[in-house]
Amino acid sequence: MVLEVSDHQVLNDAEVAALLENFSSSYDYGENESDSCCTSPPCPQDFSLNFDRAFLPALYSLLFLLGLLGNGAVAAVLLSRRTALSSTDTFLLHLAVADTLLVLTLPLWAVDAAVQWVFGSGLCKVAGALFNINFYAGALLLACISFDRYLNIVHATQLYRRGPPARVTLTCLAVWGLCLLFALPDFIFLSAHHDERLNATHCQYNFPQVGRTALRVLQLVAGFLLPLLVMAYCYAHILAVLLVSRGQRRLRAMRLVVVVVVAFALCWTPYHLVVLVDILMDLGALARNCGRESRVDVAKSVTSGLGYMHCCLNPLLYAFVGVKFRERMWMLLLRLGCPNQRGLQRQPSSSRRDSSWSETSEASYSGL
């Protein structure tokens, strides 16, 4: 998945000539294939383009600032610990890195939406791949956290404690490697292309319609459905075990990680439902017309913005739900010269209260 403003296939010169001669094409920015493609002109994109110009730059700029500050704070808190990170904290650190790298690409896409792509094909490939790598990494790392908790609580298997930190490091490396593999189409097929109809240059895919559909299916399955199914399976079994055992201490330890997973589902489900509708239109299962195309384009812009908010939401969840995250943030600010020591003096009692379970296998977040 690349931002929707740039997710369009490119026509070669022969195809453009045929388009102009026969007034035949279907183009979601040029890719609206149907049985009537050869008898009807392409749909106008004025409404969706104007909406993107007004909506996306402001949203991406805000998410860039919030995501950079929030995830930077999470990484700083985790790295400030004097002891080794737990398995879950290590996954969370990688998740913060993934979210940070994703939001770093948003200013580029904001310029693309507001004006046009002015950064050349090389940066187009890098930005698209970087965006997709970290999109997939965020979902897969949450699935890893869920599976870690599942083994730890349901099966009482401390998988990553028996070989720390090698196993968790290898798991994270495997996740990043898989995400890099998923992003190969971006390195190969993305390029800066000047669209004569729009009189603008955009970062676009240059492959056939079937390639676009396949990429969307991959995004839907590998970037959303499979991770969500893993999370749902793991936490359903975890909650069942904890409710039967009445493990209130464990339930408290699970609170933050469950909230983070629920936030992932709420943020990304609307977007992927719209993607599913778009896939069905590509496959001909749903009729494609100009009104529906325009509504889908606008819906993709709005729901993708909601999905990107997830990158900024995690740090807020840590701050409001994670007691130990707040404590360590205050301690970090104190070391950096924060003058508000009165509030910090009240922290140790809470820290002692949590430490009895936060460093055991029952805890979800030893650092947060």
Swiss-Prot record:
GO terms for cellular component: cell surface; cytoplasm; external side of plasma membrane; plasma membrane. Changing D278A: Abolishes binding to CXCL10 and CXCL11 and CXCL11-induced chemotaxis. Reduces CXCL9 and CXCL10-induced chemotaxis. Keywords: Angiogenesis, Apoptosis, Cell membrane, Chemotaxis, Disulfide bond, G-protein coupled receptor, Glycoprotein, Membrane, Receptor, Sulfation, Transducer, Transmembrane, Transmembrane helix. Isoform 1 and isoform 2 are mainly expressed in heart, kidney, liver and skeletal muscle. Isoform 1 is also expressed in placenta. Isoform 2 is expressed in endothelial cells. Expressed in T-cells (at protein level). Changing Y29F: Reduces sulfation, binding to CXCL10 and CXCL9-, CXCL10- and CXCL11-induced chemotaxis. Abolishes sulfation, binding to CXCL10 and CXCL11 and CXCL9-, CXCL10- and CXCL11-induced chemotaxis. Changing E293A: Reduces binding to CXCL10 and CXCL9- and CXCL11-induced chemotaxis. Abolishes binding to CXCL11 and CXCL10-induced chemotaxis. PROSITE patterns: G_PROTEIN_RECEP_F1_1, G_PROTEIN_RECEP_F1_2. The modification Sulfotyrosine is found at Y27, Y29. Changing E293K: Abolishes binding to CXCL10 and CXCL11 and CXCL9-, CXCL10- and CXCL11-induced chemotaxis. Residues 342-368 are annotated as: Disordered. This is C-X-C chemokine receptor type 3. It comes from Homo sapiens. The gene is CXCR3.
